[in-house]
Amino acid sequence: MYGIEYTTFLIYLISIILFNYILKSITRMMDYIIYKFLLIVTITSIVVNAQNYGVNLPITGSMDTSYVNATKGKPFLTSTLCLYYPTEARTEINDNEWTNTLSQLFLTKGWPTGSVYFKEYDDIATFSVDPQLYCDYNIVLMRYNSNLELDMSELANLILNEWLCNPMDITLYYYQQTDEANKWIAMGQSCTIKVCPLNTQTLGIGCQTTNTRTFEEVATAEKLVITDVVDGVNHKLDVTTATCTIRNCKKLGPRENVAVIQVGGADILDITSDPTTNPQTERIMRINWKKWWQVFYTIVDYVNQIVQAMSKRSRSLNSAAFYYRV
């Protein structure tokens, strides 16, 4: 009897030892497989250097500021350049082949024939109503005129920045500007804008809400108006809506594929809204020549340096979106 019990006990003991050995062997094998898999994944991630685009990324408006200029140090073989100039330039040059001549000169700087487009506009006021910038790089030439300095500044502010605009129903609602980036932009053949600031009881401050003749006039018969009022205060507006479209706009950031070249003038245009900060003159340059041929020759000479200060990763500006966007 004792022999049978002793044998049974040995069998159980051997079974436990064997099971424990098998379990440890399986554990070591699983650890080896897991560690090897993690090592392979780590090495693969380093080698591939994979990037994840567009997964739960916040929408911030302008995308171009997060990219490095892709054209830096390379020929501009796949890019387009639009050169906007006033009618007076063509009139003064008086040569039917002048654009062909400039195209050949741009070719010497690495811009293939057909990649540079010459766009003419009548004057600053007309261009302000319908600015459309479609090329990868856009250079706008403005002849300085002391009588149009403020109009030039507003146009530069419009085209050098990206704006998100929504319609305004001024007949039904009051409006307020929330911060420095919030502006009211009006375009049209004739924009006259009056405002009446309101207190917390929606009563006019220095004006009568029922009498537009008591409103403060901030623009008179202009084609482009960027209106800035006191932030955080409701305003009732009066606008010549028959000849003007006004939008509530938010500045998203710089439109980095646009540069403004000022022809003449003592100082470069300043498009800064905040008087306490340094002048905002990014991508605003000045050329001091009397003759337009010399202006264009200078642009050809410095076109690549000008483009290096820009980036082609910006949205195209189409004023039709301003008028019809809902």
From Swiss-Prot:
Major subcellular location class: virion
Location relative to the cell: Virion; Host endoplasmic reticulum lumen
GO cellular-component term (any): T=13 icosahedral viral capsid
Record region (GPR motif): 253-255
UniProt cross-references to Pfam families, sorted A to Z: VP7
Glycosylation sites: N69
Residues holding Ca(2+) 1: D95, G206, T214, E216
Gene Ontology molecular function: metal ion binding
Entry PTM: N-glycosylated.
Residues spanning the signal sequence: 1-50
Source species, domain of life: Viruses
This protein's UniProt keywords: Calcium, Capsid protein, Disulfide bond, Glycoprotein, Host endoplasmic reticulum, Host-virus interaction, Metal-binding, Outer capsid protein, Signal, T=13 icosahedral capsid protein, Virion
Sites where the protein binds Ca(2+) 2: Q177, D228, V229, D231, D301
Region span, CNP motif: 165-167
Entry function: Calcium-binding protein that interacts with rotavirus cell receptors once the initial attachment by VP4 has been achieved. Rotavirus attachment and entry into the host cell probably involves multiple sequential contacts between the outer capsid proteins VP4 and VP7, and the cell receptors. Following entry into the host cell, low intracellular or intravesicular Ca(2+) concentration probably causes the calcium-stabilized VP7 trimers to dissociate from the virion. This step is probably necessary for the membrane-disrupting entry step and the release of VP4, which is locked onto the virion by VP7.
Further facts: Some rotavirus strains are neuraminidase-sensitive and require sialic acid to attach to the cell surface. Some rotavirus strains are integrin-dependent. Some rotavirus strains depend on ganglioside for their entry into the host cell. Hsp70 also seems to be involved in the entry of some strains.
Oligomeric and partner information: Homotrimer; disulfide-linked. 2 Ca(2+) ions bound at each subunit interface in the trimer hold the trimer together. Interacts with the intermediate capsid protein VP6. Interacts with the outer capsid protein VP5*.
Protein name as catalogued: Outer capsid glycoprotein VP7
UniProt source species: Rotavirus A (isolate RVA/Cow/Japan/KK3/1983/G10P8[11])
